[in-house]
Design a protein with these regions (language model features):
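Sec-dependent N-terminal signal peptides
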Residues: 5-13
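N-terminal signal peptide c-region/cleavage motif recognized by signal peptidases
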Residues: 13-19
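Mature extracellular/passenger domains of Gram-negative fimbrial/pilin and adhesin proteins
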Residues: 19-177
Length: 177
């Protein structure tokens, strides 16, 4: 049996800015120009839970028969944000960028595959890019609070799956713009 759990660490960045607005009015004798600068400060919180698979048979991981689990990134703001980006980095490195597979800390034979759980960000079941590049979602938020589901699954990184812990961390940077 392989004992593993996926621990997720999330780093969030929330800069919010609205650009300056300028207007000009023609009046007798000259032009009056006024400038209005505005900074919008919205409050947001984001949470993500740990994902634990418990003990799994090495053969099941090798066959790919361990079921996906959903890791939910829950975002709650006091207003609907216009747009956002997500950036993912893996604490223990990336094994297969094209398929969204990250390494684990102490077990080089097991990794985790990350896929989108629905079409909130990108098409469902497409691999998540874990390389520090900002991902702009396909769909903009339509509510102040929303959830982004991410499918997580342990996968074999070769022909042999060794018993032991298979822990890792995923860093998520969420930027609203």
């Amino acid at each position: 049996m392989i004992k593993k759990s996926l621990f997720i660490l999330a780093g969030f960045s929330f800069p919010f800015y609205a650009g300056a607005t300028s207007f000009a009015s023609n009046v007798t004798g000259g032009t009056v120009t006024s400038n209005l600068s505005m900074t919008v400060k919205a409050s947001c919180s984001a949470t993500v839970g740990d994902v634990a698979f418990g003990d799994q048979a090495a053969g099941n991981i090798k066959k790919g028969s361990v079921a996906d689990k959903i890791m939910s990134l829950a975002i709650a703001c006091d207003t609907t944000m216009a747009n956002y980006t997500l950036t993912f980095t893996a604490a223990d490195g990336v094994k297969d960028l094209a398929n969204g597979i990250i390494n684990t800390k102490l077990n080089s034979t097991v990794g985790y595959q990350l896929k989108w759980g629905d079409s909130t960000v990108k098409p469902v079941d497409t691999a998540i890019t874990v390389n520090g590049t900002a991902i702009t979602p396909t769909n903009k938020p339509t509510a102040a609070s929303f959830t982004i589901p991410i499918k997580v699954k342990p996968v074999a990184l070769g022909e042999v799956v060794s018993p032991g812990a298979a822990n890792t961390a995923l860093n998520i940077k969420l930027t609203f713009n």
